[in-house]
């Protein structure tokens, strides 16, 4: 069904569809199930990509094909943090989605990704990088209040990581804050003001999110770009969404577009 929907949308949009996919966190946990395995995720990527691009596949013992599909390539972006996820992304994906707005952590993850690409026999830089995080333009104290849910959300993935890998394989700036966590209620997942975020302090909120004045946002987005980010995806679910979009559309995106154009001109001149 996912492949068919993507193939239809490719036809409607002239090949503009990308697939963003992960192991499933809240969608499965509210059903009492854990996230799916990395092996299942990798298999799903292959099946969906083949079907959308018009190739026949064998899935659960049956040969499947979308005979009308295949005009377009399907870029696949994988959401993940752990060594296994990064290795798989470096092996098969076109993009990596990191739910973080911390340039230093992004830089660490990008380095791991580049090593995974080379280990898989691909040129370093084959996989693009997206940072996904809440952004709130305005007073920092108000922004913290509206976005504190996000480090709490990310903590679910961090807890999975520290339960699976030795802590010395992961940055302390990623894992340290979950020591104070006592639990997480998925019925209040990604909810502004939820008690889920009671353990989250200002420092980690400032690092993981994009807060402050328009100039603060521009500065941090430039830091993310310098750390290896190709795309920034705003989690626009903190209130005052229309006002936030107006500021981004009127001030922040044009400034970033100008900076990107200047960087491109500089590279061309060299």
Predicted segments with their positions:
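Loop-centered beta-sheet repeat module
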Residues: 77-117
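Glycine-rich, proline-tolerant flexible connector loops at the mouths of alpha/beta enzymes
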Residues: 25-28, 100-103, 233-246
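Hydrophobic faces of well-ordered beta-strands that scaffold small-molecule active sites
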Residues: 17-21, 76-79, 96-98, 127-133, ...
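Conserved, mostly hydrophobic/aromatic
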Residues: 9, 48, 76, 89, ...
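Short, flexible active-site-proximal loops enriched in glycine and acidic residues
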Residues: 12-22, 53-61
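An alpha-helical appendage that flanks or caps ligand/catalytic pockets
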Residues: 34-66, 106, 111-226, 257-270
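Structural motif
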Residues: 12, 91-92, 227-229
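Glycine-rich anion/phosphate-binding loops
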Residues: 1-8
């Amino acid at each position: 069904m996912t492949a068919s929907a993507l193939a239809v949308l490719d036809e409607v949009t002239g090949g503009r569809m990308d697939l963003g996919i992960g192991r499933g966190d809240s969608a499965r946990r509210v059903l009492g199930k854990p996230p799916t395995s990395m092996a299942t995720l990798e298999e799903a990527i292959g099946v969906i990509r083949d079907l959308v691009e018009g190739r026949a596949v064998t899935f659960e013992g049956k040969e499947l094909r979308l005979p009308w599909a295949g005009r377009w390539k399907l870029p696949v972006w994988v959401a993940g943090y752990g060594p296994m996820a990064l290795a798989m992304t470096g092996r098969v994906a076109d993009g990596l989605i990191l739910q973080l707005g911390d340039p230093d952590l992004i830089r660490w993850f990008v380095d791991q990704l580049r090593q995974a690409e080379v280990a898989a026999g691909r040129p370093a830089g084959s996989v693009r990088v997206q940072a996904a995080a809440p952004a709130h333009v305005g007073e920092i104290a108000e922004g913290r209040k509206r976005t504190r849910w996000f480090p709490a959300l990310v903590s679910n993935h961090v807890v999975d990581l520290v339960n699976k890998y030795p802590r010395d394989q992961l940055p302390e700036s990623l894992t340290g804050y979950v020591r104070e966590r006592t639990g997480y209620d998925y019925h209040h997942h990604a909810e502004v003001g939820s008690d889920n975020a009671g353990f989250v302090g200002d420092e980690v909120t400032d690092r993981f999110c994009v807060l402050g004045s328009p100039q603060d946002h521009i500065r941090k987005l430039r830091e993310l770009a310098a750390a290896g980010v190709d795309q920034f995806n705003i989690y626009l679910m903190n209130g005052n969404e229309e006002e936030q979009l107006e500021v981004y559309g009127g001030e922040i995106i044009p400034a970033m577009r100008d900076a990107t154009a200047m960087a491109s001109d500089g590279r061309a001149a060299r």
